[in-house]
């Protein structure tokens, strides 16, 4: 599995601010959007270009570069993933949205989809899953499986922080996806929280506890 940890100084600086215990909802939300925007820029750097002809401002036909082939659907994992969508839209404002919601079954401890609203022609699109954190990997693995079952063949993932345990689990389950993250953190604690992590990203984005 392709794993890219973005080392850009602006990404690291902004992520560092997000780790503060005193951060406000407004600031956390803003930084989530800004980092997601920077990560989206990195994800799309590998997209192919093709020449196309348009009528230029001077009244003559000219050749311009345009992204080739596949369109994009952004896939936020509810609810925290919603806070990352605007960062993607800054670069791909026409992206379709496919939403997935997961909950943990208390008996099996496995993630179960409680909501899925996917756009059409997934097999013709790049699916960009967004979720602030990759911890154990359970929800992410289940989301990728759901998308593949619906026809998706090209899946990329953006997270703000990722745990090595989650990366390993995802790589074993879906070695064909690509992961772009602002940080590979140290480990999961005994409660399965990422250390040093960000705390509960969903609560911090939406101002809940």
From Swiss-Prot:
Q: Provide any one GO MF term from the record.
A: GTP binding
GO terms, biological process: UMP salvage; uracil salvage
Pfam families associated with the record: UPRTase
Reactions that this protein is recorded to catalyse: UMP + diphosphate = 5-phospho-alpha-D-ribose 1-diphosphate + uracil
Q: Where does 5-phospho-alpha-D-ribose 1-diphosphate bind?
A: 79, 104, 131-139, 200
Cofactor(s) listed in the protein's UniProt record = Mg(2+)
Q: What class of enzyme is it?
A: transferase
Signal peptide segment: none
Task: Cite the annotated pathway.
Answer: Pyrimidine metabolism; UMP biosynthesis via salvage pathway; UMP from uracil: step 1/1
Describe regulators of its activity: Allosterically activated by GTP.
Bound how, and how many: what does the cofactor note say?
Binds 1 Mg(2+) ion per subunit. The magnesium is bound as Mg-PRPP.
Where is uracil annotated to bind? 194, 199-201
Question: So what EC number does this one have?
Answer: 2.4.2.9
- Keyword Acyltransferase in the entry? The reply is no
Family stated for the protein in its record: Belongs to the UPRTase family.
Its annotated function is as follows: Catalyzes the conversion of uracil and 5-phospho-alpha-D-ribose 1-diphosphate (PRPP) to UMP and diphosphate.
Q: What is this protein called?
A: Uracil phosphoribosyltransferase
Task: Identify the gene encoding this protein.
Answer: upp
